[in-house]
Amino acid sequence: MLRRRRQAALVASLLALLLLGGAAAASALTSQPIRYNHNVHVVAYKMDCRFCHSSAMKTASAGIPSVEKCMICHRVIAVDHPEIKKIAQYWKEKKPIPWNRVTELPDYTYFPHFRMVNAGIACLTCHPGMDKVDVAVQEQEFTMGFCLKCHKARGVSIECWSCHI
Amino acid sequence: MLDRRDFLKLGGATAFAALFGGCDRIPKKIIPFVIPPENTALGESLWYASACRQCPAGCGIVVRVSEGRAKKIEGNPLHPVNRGKLCARGQAGLQALYHPERIGRPLKLSGPRGSGKFAETSWEEALSILLTGLKKLQAAAPASLLMLTEPMRGHRNLVAARFMRAFGSPHRIAWDPFGQDALLAANEAVFGIRDVPEYDIANARYLLSFSGDFLETGISPVHYGRAYGQMRQSRPTVRGKFVHFGPRLSMTAANADVFLPIAPGSEGAAALGIAHVMVREKLTPSAAAAASLWAAGLSRMTPEAVGKATGLLPSDIEAVAHEFAGNAPGIAMAGDGAAGCTNGTYNLAGAALLNALAGNVGRQGGISFPNRLAAFSRFGADAALLLPPPESGFASVRDSVEKMRKGTYRMALLSGSTNPAFSLPAPLKFGEALLSVPQVVSFASFLDETASLSDLVLPVPTFLEEWGDDIAPAGHAGDALSMLQPVVDPFRDTRQMPDILIAAARELGGAVAAALPWAGFRECLEKSYAGMGVNLEAARRDGGVFPGKTPAPRTAPKAQRPSLPVAAEAEFEGDPARYPLFLHVYPSIAHSDGRGANLSWLQELPDPVTTAVWRNWVEVNPKTAETLGLADGDGVVVASPFGSMEAFVVVHPATAPGVVALPLGQGHTRYGTNAANRGGNPFSLLPVKADRGSGAPARQSTRVSLAKAKLAGSLVRTVNVEGQWKYENIL
């Protein structure tokens, strides 16, 4: 009896530790200085992803919008919302918003956004679920298999140095 | 209770959880712009064309800018002066931009004047101090305002000149330790034209240089360096020959086919010795000109007589004369080492005479005098303000020091990188005199020796953050003009000096406001160039306007019948018994007059001759060193009748015996951590003497003595990669 209770205590403490550690890491990834809602912007207001991520058509990086770009609309829209007030404060202090990175590819890969976007690949192909969430999440793991599956299906280059340059 | 086994299990589990629970990705930050710079593309570079202001040569540059930050400066391939090339000093312009010691806010004196103690203040307060001072002066005595700057060109000079003229003060002085006064005076005497000539080195077959270190310093080192490469290598059957005369083996001299060491200040005699042989042997195209020169006294400049004065072998003079005359077109040029003597004009006139005698004026591969102001004729009398003659202003500065002491000035406006408190001979006591001016306002990016003496410092942007225009003093055939534009947003809270003057003029009202009727300097430039029919957008894209059609050069009225330069001997201060060695000072390739000393890239640039970095040295001939008991790397005190300084000995076989050579540029007491306390300042050894013909500062005019001394630290010289260099092996 005593032994079983001890075992239960062990398992409970182990679980608690794992949960704590995991939760801490998860909250660091999903928490952002501003709780930006992708769903509202993309679905409710039908905004094109490229309005904010405007260098996706031009450069390798899709880009994070400048504070100025947020303020183009939020000077007049939803100014009383607590999250918008935070943006206004950054703008007032002329400070950039320190976003936490969610999606990241390893350094040994080269992923030119503009090639995919200009070839007509929808953003949601690689960033599924982004239209349903508020704070950005990475639902799709970017393994080489994931990339190659699509490259093969479309008959585009699968040479090593297309991506590993 | 826990037994040992459970304790271990729990411990293991905790370690596992701690390790793998925390083994998730640490979030990285993505920091977007608050306001993105125009045309920014992430990860993509933009190239902006502008012009370099690290030295007065006026090279065109293109700057690679990525995400709003300047990353690299290159030469502008379209610019006629440098055609895509750029020197180390130009490259180091980035360090000035990002320098941690740059002045970022207006500074107000917070201790006694000259203490270098300043406190930051707002632009509102700083400008109100400036305006209160100017308004008081305007009402009481406008002529007691002094403006002392570096030589400026283009519209910023126009703005400064109009401001001072309308304010009512004649005291506008531009100081440049390496002004071309002697060259201007020599060309006026020989050719009847007071201008800097264009040397077509690229197409020359023979090049004579008299202490002219044109590859490293001088009027336009990048332009001449490129042309020199063409002279040597761009023609399939001709490799131009280069002979260098001078008291020191500079980098330029080391490039020559023949280096002929001569006594300091005897460059003019050497040139006339060559002229003598050319006339005697009838090697000149114009017999009439030759005859009149011969009668005027050239007959006395025999190779033997010249050999005695210069230390040259008469046979060398004969040989060079024959080669120079037989390999037309050729060029004779003389530079700072010859111009900086008390007979500088004579030395330079000697070289100019050789060009006239050989018939090299106005021909390809010779020298010419382009009409560089042709494009600005609509400015009338103001046109000359856009490209003022590159004079040193030494006489005016000396006069102004007197006036400071007498209390003529009640306010001084200072700007520019020539730093008079550092680069004027110490006996002049410029700094002391400046302290007696009641109010001194500096426009500066760094707290150098001069700015430290002021009571208000207004921070100005670096050339990479400026609007402006420029006309290079040499290196183009006519009206090529450069456009400066900010390649990045200003890093600090700075304002351009012309902008401050225009704003001040608006507040002062009346004639001053009418003279500067623009909202700002950018508007001044744009209105002015729009009036000239310049397509500003294209000009800024290309870095300037570079016309393909060359305007006709100016004619040199006396080129056919040059007069013989009046012979003059170089004078040297100091009793030869007490000060046995001639002092030869030369601008450092990295720091010039000292303006580059605050940039660590330039400090760690090895000197091309000695490979020394970060400190000061004195080049001594091995025989002289042996007599004085000095060895390579020893510390010495170099003393002249006017001052003394410390330096390390570099024993160098190609320094003439009896001469010691010191690079200028080090020896700062202020100007930031990279510059301060790196040996002595050679300007402190110099007398207040001028070239008799032109009034230029005569730096090569004193003798010195060397005394062994124990100095802290040592001279660092980088590894020599060209193989064995020990002088014992080549002596």
For the regions a language model picked out, list residue spans one by one:
Chain B
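N-terminal export/assembly segments and adjacent metallocofactor-ligating motifs
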Residues: 1-281, 289, 313, 319, ...
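Domain-level signature for respiratory redox metalloenzymes
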Residues: 62, 141, 145, 199-206, ...
